[in-house]
Amino acid sequence: ASDVYKRQALCLKQVNANGGINGKQLEIITMDEQGDATQAVTCFTKMCDQGITALVGDVTTTPTLALAAESADYNMPMVTASATAEAVTYDAETDTVNENVFRATFTDPFQGIKMADYAYQKLGYTKAAVIFQKGADYNEGLAENFVNEFESLGGTIVDQETYSEGDVDYKTQLTTILGKGPEVVFCPNYYQEVGQILAQAESVGLAVPFLG
């Protein structure tokens, strides 16, 4: 998130140096929501009290989903550079687009589907396992779309393992996956966990390729 802010600040500096927008200088108000949906809404409300006219963010999926709903009530333009859940910009239940929300990245369905296509069609794998964090919109979204697409192509998902936020030991899940004999493992998780998962996979003898 800090990298995103640094780039926003650089862009702001460049825009203001070139006269701003419609002759007006821009100002960024930044608050840390700590990756929490409730805290994100609290920060948004505080920023509205300070007179913001547009929202850039959030960075990750769960708080962005909360902000998408909240910003709609204010009819405030919102753009995210990195939140990938389809529901950020589209409500599948009502088949409506969230007209005030925009994104500058791909979606969970796109990522999960394309990775399944790559694994099955390009790499030739027919048996896959998945390990992902449960209760996390981003991780679950990618896992679900990968599984559905891989099976629709004719592949077999031999195992799906989950872990909880804050876990640091994945050996039990990885040992279970090893016993199911996959040719490849899909690991749609954040880099902090992925590094540990890969190291522990090696320690239990799970030597198949990981995709993520």
Please state what every model-predicted region is.
Residues 47-59, 77-81, 129-133, 181-191, ...:
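Periplasmic-binding protein-like
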Residues 6-28, 151-156:
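Signal peptide-proximal N-terminal region
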Residues 96-165, 184:
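An alpha-beta-alpha
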Residues 142-212:
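Extracellular/periplasmic bilobed ligand-binding domains
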Residues 33-38, 54, 60-65, 83-89, ...:
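Solvent-exposed loop/turn segments at secondary-structure junctions
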Residues 25-49, 111-114, 161-177:
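Structural motif
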Residues 76-102:
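Flexible loop/hinge segments that line or gate small-molecule binding clefts
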Residues 1-5:
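Short, small-residue-biased leader/transition segments that mark boundaries at the very start
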